[in-house]
Amino acid sequence: MAEEGSPAGGVMDVNTALPEVLKTALIHDGLAPGIREAAKALDKRQAHLCVLAANCDEPMYVKLVEALCAEHQINLIKVDDNKKLGEWVGLCKIDREGKPRKVVGCSCVVVKDYGKESQAKDVIEEYFKSKK
């Protein structure tokens, strides 16, 4: 738990790198949130990375996304909560204290453009290299 709060100083793991990669991609307009946008990006082979919420309530969404990722050899990461994923990709309002509120759940998001090189991006890429 201690390393989670200090990604700049210590070694970054996938769970701390993923939100950072998604935020950077959001800033550089490189995200395709939602099943329709994600499916289009996956089908056109524009995706570098796909993130799927494990608590997605529609099993056919999960099947479609997993099949497209497998067919086009696109890396897939599953996160446990669609509200958390929605917050990471900017589907929320930020209040005065900087806390997210009115978070909308997001079942699937595709990273089409990482935006810029970063340590977080390298951590994600190393994670997939080690899985192969």
Curated annotation (Swiss-Prot):
It comes from the Eukaryota. Disulfide bonds: none annotated. GO terms for molecular function: structural constituent of ribosome. PROSITE patterns: RIBOSOMAL_S12E (PS01189). GO terms for cellular component: ribonucleoprotein complex; ribosome. GO terms for biological process: translation. Keywords: Ribonucleoprotein, Ribosomal protein. It holds the Pfam family Ribosomal_L7Ae. Signal peptide: none annotated. Belongs to the eukaryotic ribosomal protein eS12 family. This is Small ribosomal subunit protein eS12.
